[in-house]
A protein has these predicted regions:
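Conserved SAM-binding site of S-adenosyl-L-methionine-dependent methyltransferases, i.e.
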Residues: 8
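S-adenosyl-L-methionine-dependent methyltransferase catalytic module, highlighting the catalytic core
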Residues: 4, 12-125
């Protein structure tokens, strides 16, 4: 089992990470933030960090995402999340689509937190 808590939303290539995980395990736990335009656009403290929703292709499949910028957080002495200035936040549906495409048929959700201070988040347990 791969345990990826607080990792996916810091990636520049989140689908690639999920694909790599799918090659080494048939079970995965993920806790992650995801992009939801309706929620984030109504949060003044968050919306300035995100570009508009866009799409990209990975292995011929389209996924929706928003680029998130760490902005001033990169200057913090503590951990801000990643060494790069940006990360890719997939939409909730794109995360689920990617897991299904990678063969994870049994997907369970929990700990949905729409009002998390850093943006909407949820946990997933998935197995092939």
């Amino acid at each position: 089992m791969v345990f990826a808590s607080g990792v996916l939303y810091h990636m520049e290539e989140p689908i690639r990470l999920l694909k790599l995980i799918s090659k080494v395990s048939d079970k995965i736990f993920i806790w992650t933030h995801y992009y939801d335009k309706g929620i984030i656009s109504n949060r003044v403290e968050l919306r300035h960090k995100f570009d508009p929703v866009s799409s990209f292709q990975y292995d011929g499949i389209s996924y929706d995402y928003a680029t998130q910028s760490y902005k001033d957080a990169l200057a913090w002495e503590g951990f801000c999340g990643g060494p790069k200035p940006i990360s890719i936040w997939l939409t909730r549906d794109s995360i689920i689509k990617a897991l299904r495409q990678l063969g994870f048929a049994d997907i369970q959700f929990n700990f949905e937190h729409l009002n998390h201070p850093n943006g909407p988040a949820f946990a997933i347990c998935a197995k092939k």
